[in-house]
From Swiss-Prot:
Its main location: cytoplasm. InterPro entries: AAA+_ATPase, AAA_lid_4, DNA_helicase_Holl-junc_RuvB, P-loop_NTPase, RuvB-like_N, RuvB_C, WH-like_DNA-bd_sf, WH_DNA-bd_sf. This is Holliday junction branch migration complex subunit RuvB. CDD domains: AAA. Residues 183-253 are annotated as: Small ATPAse domain (RuvB-S). It comes from Ehrlichia ruminantium (strain Gardel). Belongs to the RuvB family. The RuvA-RuvB-RuvC complex processes Holliday junction (HJ) DNA during genetic recombination and DNA repair, while the RuvA-RuvB complex plays an important role in the rescue of blocked DNA replication forks via replication fork reversal (RFR). RuvA specifically binds to HJ cruciform DNA, conferring on it an open structure. The RuvB hexamer acts as an ATP-dependent pump, pulling dsDNA into and through the RuvAB complex. RuvB forms 2 homohexamers on either side of HJ DNA bound by 1 or 2 RuvA tetramers; 4 subunits per hexamer contact DNA at a time. Residues 4-182 are annotated as: Large ATPase domain (RuvB-L).
Length: 331
C-alpha cells in the first residue's frame, strides 16, 4: 500500500462539499464551548513551550466536528496535518511509514481509531509514550528488535464508539474530549454561517426550522441546507423561509423531529414486536448494518427518549409510541 493510499486527504475523509463551510480557527468554531475553551488553553501552553500538545481523543456521535477540530488544532499550532483512518492501516509497515515521515510537533489524525487492528494498536503504544518504534528485523531464531526514534508528535484519535477502544490505548490519550449534540440555537448559527459562505439567503426562521430537524448534528444540518438550496435554485425563490424549508424537508422525508423513514421503520418494528428486541434481529429486519444502527440511528433516538437499551434488548418508550400514533407516514 502506497503512502498516498494510507495518508488520506481531508477531502476523502469528510464530505468535500462541507470543506468550504468548515471553520479554520477555534474562535470561528460554533458549539462545544467547554471543549473549545479547554483546547485554547492546551494549545496556547504547548505553543508557548514549543512542545507537541498531548495526545487527544475526540469521541461522540458522528457529524459533530471531530475532523474539523483536528484540522483546527493543527492550524492553531502552525504545524503539518496528516490524516488517515483505522481501517486503512492494515499492516505494521503502513503505520511505520506514516510515523517515520512526520516532522517534529506534527499532528497525525486517525479517524475511526476504534477500528485499528490490535497489532497496529500495539505499535502505537511506544510511539505515543516514548516517540519510538520497535521494529522486528529478521525471522525465527535470528529475529531481533530494532528501536527507531521518531519526532515528537501529537496523535488525535476520533471515534464514535469509545467502548471499542482497548484500555491501554484509551489510557495513553492525555486529553480525552467528549463532543455533545448541538442545541437548536447553536445549529441555527452553524446554518446561517454556512448559508453565507455558499451565498444563499436564509431567514432566521428558515435556519431555525432546518436546525430543529437536524438531529442536533452539524453534518446533517449542512447536508439539509445544501439540498434545500437545490430546491430554491430550481424554483427561483430568493430566500429560504420557514415555509419553504418545511416543505422541502417534508419532500426529503424528514419529519418535524428530524426522523427519516428508516428511523420510523426502526421504531415501528420494535413497537410491533411488543418485547425487547436484540440489535441483530433489528439489523436483519431493516437490512441495516448493526454498526450503522448503533452509530447513526440509535444515539439520537436515545437522546430524545424514544428508545432504551436494556440487557434484554431495545425497548420503545411511551413517548415514542405516542408520537407514532400522532403521525401518518407513507411508508
Amino acid at each position: 500500500m502506497f503512502m498516498k493510499d494510507i495518508l488520506q486527504s481531508s477531502e476523502c475523509i469528510e464530505d468535500q462539499q462541507n470543506i468550504s463551510m468548515r471553520p479554520n480557527l477555534l474562535d470561528e468554531f460554533i458549539g462545544q464551548s467547554s471543549v473549545v475553551s479547554n483546547l485554547k488553553i492546551f494549545i496556547d501552553a504547548a505553543y508557548e513551550r514549543k512542545e507537541p500538545i498531548d495526545h487527544i481523543l475526540l469521541y461522540g456521535p458522528p457529524g459533530l466536528g471531530k475532523t474539523t477540530l483536528a484540522h483546527i488544532i493543527a492550524k492553531e499550532l502552525k504545524v503539518n496535518f496528516r490524516s488517515t483512518a483505522g481501517p486503512l492501516l492494515s499492516k505494521a509497515g503502513d503505520l511505520a511509514a506514516i510515523l517515520t515521515n512526520l516532522q517534529a510537533r506534527d499532528v497525525l489524525f486517525i479517524d475511526e481509531i476504534h477500528r485499528l487492528n490490535r497489532n497496529i494498536e500495539e505499535i502505537l503504544y511506544s510511539a505515543m509514550e516514548d516517540f519510538s518504534l520497535d521494529i522486528i528485523v529478521g525471522e525465527g531464531c535470528g529475529a531481533r528488535t530494532l528501536r527507531v526514534d521518531i519526532p515528537p508528535f501529537t496523535l488525535i484519535g476520533a471515534t464514535t464508539r469509545i467502548g471499542l477502544l482497548s484500555n491501554p490505548l484509551r489510557d495513553r490519550f492525555g486529553i480525552p474530549m467528549h463532543l455533545e449534540f448541538y442545541s437548536t440555537e447553536e445549529l441555527t448559527k452553524v446554518i446561517k454561517r454556512a448559508a453565507k459562505v455558499i451565498h444563499t439567503n436564509i431567514s432566521n426562521n428558515g435556519a431555525e426550522e432546518i436546525s430543529l430537524r437536524s438531529r442536533g448534528t452539524p453534518r446533517i444540518a449542512l447536508r439539509l441546507l445544501r439540498r434545500i438550496r437545490d430546491f430554491i435554485s430550481v424554483t427561483k425563490q430568493d430566500t429560504i423561509t420557514h415555509e419553504f424549508a418545511d416543505q422541502a424537508l417534508l419532500r426529503l422525508g424528514i419529519d418535524k423531529l428530524g426522523l427519516d423513514r428508516q428511523d420510523i421503520k426502526y421504531l415501528q418494528f420494535i413497537y410491533e414486536a411488543n418485547n425487547p428486541i436484540g440489535i441483530d434481529t433489528i439489523s436483519s429486519a431493516l437490512s441495516e448494518d448493526t454498526g450503522n444502527i448503533e452509530e447513526t440511528i440509535e444515539p439520537y433516538l436515545i437522546k430524545i427518549n424514544f428508545i432504551q437499551r436494556t440487557p434484554r434488548g431495545r425497548v420503545i418508550t411511551q413517548k415514542a409510541i405516542s408520537y407514532l400514533n400522532e403521525q401518518t407516514y407513507n411508508m
